Amino acid sequence: MIRQCLHLTTSPLLLLLLIALSSIGTVVAKSDGPKIASIQLETEPSMPFYFENSDTVLFLRLDTGEVYQSFDGGVEWKVLGKDHETEGETAGLANGAVMIQAHPYDNQKAYILGRHGVHWVTTDQGKTWREFEVPAAPSMFNEPLRFHGEDSGKVIFQGERCSAFACVETSYYTRNNFETVKPMRDTARGCMWAVATPGFADSTTEHAEEIRDRVLCIVHGLKNPFASAYRLVYSDSFFEDDQDGIEAKLNEGRPVAGIINAAARTKYIVAAAKSQGTDELAMFVTDDAITWHRAEFGNHKIEESAYTVLEGTNYSIEVDVMNTDRSTNMGVLFTSNSNGTYFTRNIEHTNRDMSGLVDFEKIAGVQGIVLVNVVDNWEEIENDPKADRKVISKISFDDGRTFQSLKVKDKDLHLHSVTAFENIGRVFSSPAPGIVMGVGNTGTHLKSYTKDGDLYVSDDAGVTWRLALEKPHKYEIGNKGAIIMAIKDNDKPTKKIQYSINHGKDWETAELDREIIPYFLTTTPDSTSLKFMLVGYVEDPADWYIYAIDFEGLHERECKDSDFENWPARLDENGEPDCLMGHKQFYRRRKSDANCFITETMFKTPKPEFKSCKCTAEDFECDYNFVRSEDRKECVPATILKAPEGTCKNDDDTFKGPSGWRLIPGNVCTRDGAVELDKEIDRPCKDALKTPSGDSKAVSSTANYIETEMFGEFFYLERAGSSRGEDETIIMRTTDGKLYVTHDHGKSWTHELKDVKIQQIAPHRYLNDRAFFLTSGKKQYYTINRAESFDAFSAPAEVNPSGLTLGYHEEFKDWMIWTGPGECSHGECPKVSFISKHRGDDWEILLRAVEKCEFMAREDRKDSGSLIFCDQHEGEKVDGQRMLVTSNDFFATSTTPLTNIIDFATMAEFIIIATRNPEKENSLKVDASVNGVEFADAEFPYNLEVPVQLAYTVLDSSTHSVFLHVTANNKMDQSYGSIIKSNSNGTSYVLSLNDVNRNNGGYVDFEKLPGLEGVALANVVSNTKNVEKGSEKKLTSMITHNDGSQWTLIPPPAKDSEGKPYSCGSDGKPTDKCSLHLHGYTERRDPRDSFGSASAIGLLFGVGNVGESLGSKSEASTFFSSDGGISWKEVKKGNYMWKFGDQGSVLVLVEELKPTRDIYFSTDEGDTWEKYQFSEKEVTVQSLSTVPSGTSKNFLIWGKETGSSKLVTINLDFSGLRDRTCNLDEDTGESEDYYLWEPKHPLQEGNCLFGHVEQYHRKKPSSHCWNDWSEAHVHRISHNCTCTEEDYECDYNYERQTDGSCALVPGLLKPNAIDYCRENPEAIEYWEPTGYRRIPLTTCQGGKNLDRWVSRPCPSHEEEYQRKHGPSGAVIFFAIIVPITIAVAAGYWVYTRWDGKFGQIRLGDGGAQSFVTSRGDSPFITIPVAIIAGTVAAVKVLPLLVMSLWRSVTGYVRIPGRRGPRPYATRDAFAARRGDYTHVVDDEDELLGDDEFEDEEGDERN
C-alpha cells in the first residue's frame, strides 16, 4: 500500500502572501524551507538507484518484486507494469523483478532483471523500457551483468541454468544492448570484458583493435572441476572460433591454475589465484590484457578473504593486506607502481572488519588525498583480540607517502569510517570539490558513534576541520557543495532535518510530518541535485517512509562568475598549490558564502583544471624487475641482471645498464632542466648473471652428518604454485625424538625444539605450510609458517595410541579434531574426540567412546562444511557394537545410518563403509555413499568366487570408480584375490582382474600411474593352485590402459642395456613365456615410491626382469618407459632408486642399499646417462628424495657411510646445468624447446584415450633449459573422439569373452532393469541391459552406443517419456549429476585434497601399524604406505584396513635399514604415493605380518 503526501515548511499565511506577490509579477519567490513529499510502504525498500545527472530514481520492493519509478526525485511514484504510463514493454514487470542495475558508464541505460528469463532495458533514463529474454536466471554467484568500458551496447549476461540436481553457470553476450543475445560459454566464475572500464580503454590505445572484443572467463580445469584448477581463458571471437579459448599467460608467459577471481580496477585487470595446499594467493595484474605480471608485496603474504582491492587511481592500485589473525583484523596498506607489479607499504595496522571492509577512502575528485583509520594499540590487540581497540584517523595529501592527524584547531580528530558507516554511498566525500564530512570525536582515539559522535566538516579537502552539528547525523551534499543536509542518527525517532548553504558553518531546520528513525539519506551520485531522498521507519506500527526533500525553492538566484573561486585541490606545507603526477589541480568552486545555487549547469559534474610542474624524484618509480630499497631512496634489482652480449669479460668490468627508475606512465611533468633518474648507469659485471657450464661438473653436492641412531619420519613442506618463496623446507624427526629442519633442501640443518621429545609429525593435510609435532604429554607444538617459528597448545587428551590423532578440515584451516584416550580409573579407556575451531586454543567434546571422527567436507559435496562422521561404540562402552554416527551440527543432533560397522574410508568423492554381513556369518559387506547422507549396499558380481568376504582392500578411486580388492585366499604368504571396479557411485561392481597379489599386511600389487588416465600396473599370482598347496607364489605383471577394463602382459624390450637380446626373445611383443615383470607395491622398502611422477607425465621407472615370471629383486634390472608404459627399455643392470626433477628434465638413479659414491643422471628422457660422484667415501643409500611435485633441481640422499655409524644427508644440486628457462608458446603448444606429447592406448588409433585426445607440454630432450613450472599442465583436450568398444566395459553380472565381447554370466538372469524406476521414483525411463556400460572416465561422443539400445518408460511416466527422450541422469541409489570433468579429475582431487589420511586397521591380537605418506604432487596416487607412531598423519588417500576387530596402530616411520620401520621420502616417495588404498581385513590374520616389519615393530616396542 502506498500513501502520498506533500507539505511545505512555510506557514499558510506566508504561502498566501507568496502566491499573491507572484501573481503581480514580483521577483521575490523565495521560500523558508524545502518542499517535502513522502510515500508510505509496508516493507523495507531496496537501495534507490538514480540515473546520473537527473532526478529520475527507481527502487525495488523486495517482498513483491515491484519496481517503483519517479521522475521528480521521489515526489511522485508509479509502479512499472501496473500504473506507469511509461512507454514500452513493461506488462510483465508487475511482480517479476529481482534486481535493478545501472549501466556504470552510460547514464541513459539501466536494466531490470527478472525471475523467469525475462528482463528489461531502458536507453533513455527510464522513459521507455524494452523487454528481452535470456534463457537463464541471473547468477547468484557472479555479477549478473558485466559492461564494456568503451562501447555501452556490449554487455555480458551471467546466469545459471538449473536442473533438479545442479546449476551450471553460463554466460551470454550482446553487442547491441540486448537487441540480440547469443550464448557464449559455461563458466566457473563468470566472464568479463578485457576493456572493462573507460580508464582501461583510454590506456590501451596501442592494442585497442586487438582487444576490442576480447572476453576473459574463469572456467573449469580441463581435467579437474575443483577451484584449484580453474583457468583464466580469453577469446576475441566470443569462443566461436575456439570453444575452449586461449589461456591467459599470467606468470612469466605461462598460464596459472587456481584462478578464483578477476576484476577490473581503473586501468587494470587483477586476477587472484590459489593453489592446492596453501592459503596464500598470487595476484596477477595487466594494464593491456596481453602482458601480465605477478604482483609483489615483499615479505607480506596475501591470503584468500584476507586482502581487499581498494579504490585506486589511474596510475596505481591500492590493496589492503591483512597481516594478523582474523580475530584481530588489522592490515597493511600497499600502493602499486604504475603497472601494478610492485607494491610498497604505505601504513600499517589499518582497521578492518570481519567481512574485509577497510577504513579507507580517497577523497572524491582530488588526486592524492586519502583518509584511513589505524589501530593505535595494535600490540595490545595482537596479544588480546578481545581488548578494546583504540582507532585513530590519519590523512595523506601525497598519495599515501606520508600520513598526519586530522585537526580541529589543535585537537586530533577521529572519524568513523567504512567499517562503521551508517549510510549508503561514499563515507566522507562526494564529487562536490573539497567538501568532506564525517562523524567522530576529538581526543586520543575514536569513541562510540552513538554516545560520543558529532558531525564535522572540512571545505578544504581535509586540511582543517570544524564542528558542524553536535550528535551523530546522517548527511549528504548537494548542488556541488552549495547545500548540505543532515538528520540526527542516534537510533531515536526524529522529525527534524537540518541544512546548510555555507559549507556547514550555519544550519537551518525543517520538519517532517512524523517522527522516524532514519535508515539512509541519499541524492544523485554526482551530488549535483538540489533534491534529497530520506528513507526511514517507525517501529509501531512497522511502516517504512520515503521522503523527497527539494531545496530548489530556497534561492532564486543563479550563481554568477563572481560567486566562484579557483580553488587549489592540494596545498603543500607552505600553503601553496602542490604538484602530483606532474601537475597542479584546480576546481572552479562556488564560494561558501555565495547566496546562490548552481541551476543552469546543475547536472554537470565539476571538472578539474591542471597546470604542469617540473619533474622531481617523486615523478619516478622503480622500473620492471627493480624494487624499492629498505629506505625507499633507491631502486635495486629484484633479479640478477643480464649483461649485454660481448661485455663482462672480467668481473672487474662494468656495463651500461638500467638505473632502476622510470618516469611514472601518465605523469605529465616537464623534463626540461629537471631531474632525470631514468638515465642508464654503469653497473659492475660481478653482479651480472653467470652462464652455467652445462656439464656434470656443474652439479654440486653438500653433505651433512646427523647425530642420531636412525632417521625417522620426514616431510617436505613444499611451496604450492601460488605461494611466494624459494625455500625447499624439510622437517625430519629422528628415532630419539629430535626435530631437524632444513630450508635449503638439506644443504644445512638446524635442531629445533631442543628441549622437546617429538613422538610424531602430523603435517596439515590441506596446507603445506603447517605441521604439528606431537609429544607424549598434553603440550603439543606446531608451525604455520614452514618451520620458521613454532607455537604450542594444550591438547585435550594424550596422543591416540591406536589410530588417527589429528584430523583437519578442508576449508576452515584452524578447525581440528583431536582423538585420544579419555580418563578412566582402570582398564582400557574409551577414546574421545574433541573439536577446536581455533587451532587448539580451546576444545569441545564431540563424542565419547569412538574409534575415530573425521570431517567429511568436500568442495563438491553439498552442505558438507560441518559434516562429521564418527565410528562410535554403542552405549559409549569399549566393548559396544560399533556404529557410524554422523552430524551436521557438531553432534547437537546426529543420525546413525549404519550399525555393526568395521570401519569406514574416504576415497575422493566416495565414502566406503565395511560392515558385518547379517546374512552370512563371519562375512563382511560394503556400503557406499557419495553425498554423506544416503547409503547403499555394494553389489558384487556373481562371478566373483569369494564365498566368505573376510578381507577387502580399497584401492584407487582416481577415475571416478572405486577399485576394490576382495581377498580369495588370506593364508599367511598365500594371499591373493580379485580386483573389482565400481560404477560412478561406488555401489555396482564388475570383475576387473583375478588372482591379484596381496601381502600379509593386506596391501595389494596394484598401482595407478600418476598423471596418466586409466593406466595401472598389477601383479597377479599365476600359480594359484600350487600356492594353495604351499608352493611359493609366481608373479606375473600386467598393465591396463583403459582403467581396468582390459589387462595385458607388459611388452619387454628387445635388448638389454648392453645391447644383448633377451634369452626368451619375443621381438618386443609380450607372450606367456616372455614379458616384462616389475616388482610392485608390496615389495617396496619405501612404500611411498611410485613408478612415475605426476609432473613428468608418461615417464616411468621400474625394477624387474624379462621372462616368464617375476624373479628375485637382487637379480633385477632397472627399466624405463617414456610413453606411459607402452614400450620399455633397460637402463641399468641392478636395483636402483629413482627420482624426477624439474618435471622430468633431470632423471636421477642411485643404487639401493649397496655401498656407492656415484649417482647417474639423464637430461634427455633417459636416452643417455652421466655419472656423478657425490662423495669421496662410499655411502649405503637408504633413500633418495626430492620435493613431492618433482619440480625441484635438488635431490637428497639419505644414508650411512660404509664402515661407520655416521648417518648422512647429501644434497645434490643440478641448477648449474642450465642457464635459462625454456620458451613456450602456449597458443600453439610447441616451440623450439617444447613438443606436444599425447597419451595413447597401444591398441587404438588416433591417440584416443577415454574418448578424447589429450596433449601435454614436454621439453625436447635436446633443449638445454629448465621447465621452471610448478605443476604439470595439460595444454588442451584437442578433441573428443567417437565411441568405440574401448570406451565400454562389461556391465554388472556380465563378463568378458575370449572374443572381447561381454556376455551374461552362465546361470544368471538379466538384471531387472525396471528396478531402476523403483529406486528412482522421479526417473522417466530405463534402458534394457545390453551387457555393456560406459567407462566412467570416457568423454567420447557419437560412434558406437553399446550401453543404450532400447529404452522403456517408467511406470506412471509414460507421458513424460513421450515428451523427453534421453537418460534421466539419476544414479543407482540417489540422484546425483556429475560433470564429465569430475569423472576425468577425481584422481587429481585425491592428490590435492587427501594428503595425509591413509590408515590401516588390523585384526587379531598382534600390534598394528599405520601407513602414511607425505604430501606430493601426483594426481593419480595409489597405494602409499609408511609407518608412523601412534597416528596416521599427512597422507593423500587412506589405505584403510577394515576388519572384524580394531587393533592398535603403533610404530615409527624411518629410512629402511637396520631393522627399522619405514621412512618418509620425496614427492614420489614422500607424498607422491597419494591416493591409494584402504583395506578391510580378516579376523585371524596378522596384518603387516612380513617378517621385516614385525621385527621393526618389535624393536620399537622394546
Swiss-Prot record:
One of its GO terms (biological process) is Golgi to endosome transport. InterPro entries: Sortilin_C, Sortilin_N, VPS10, VPS10-sortilin, WD40/YVTN_repeat-like_dom_sf. It is a multi-pass membrane protein. CDD domains: Sialidase_non-viral. One of its GO terms (cellular component) is Golgi apparatus. Residues 1391-1422 are cytoplasmic. Residues 30-1369, 1444-1502 are lumenal. Residues 1-29 form the signal peptide. Keywords: Glycoprotein, Golgi apparatus, Membrane, Protein transport, Receptor, Repeat, Signal, Transmembrane, Transmembrane helix, Transport. The chain crosses the membrane at residues 1370-1390, 1423-1443. Gene3D superfamilies: 2.10.70.80, 3.30.60.270, YVTN repeat-like/Quinoprotein amine dehydrogenase. It is found in: Golgi apparatus, trans-Golgi network membrane; Prevacuolar compartment membrane. Glycans are attached at N314, N339, N985, N1280. BNR repeats lie at residues 68-78, 120-130, 395-404, 456-466, 498-508, 740-750, 1119-1129, 1160-1171. Functions as a sorting receptor in the Golgi compartment required for the intracellular sorting and delivery of soluble vacuolar proteins, like carboxypeptidase Y (CPY) and proteinase A. Executes multiple rounds of sorting by cycling between the late Golgi and a prevacuolar endosome-like compartment. Belongs to the VPS10-related sortilin family. PANTHER family: SORTILIN RELATED, SORTILIN-RELATED RECEPTOR. This is Vacuolar protein sorting/targeting protein 10. The lineage of its organism: Eukaryota, Fungi, Dikarya, Ascomycota, Pezizomycotina.
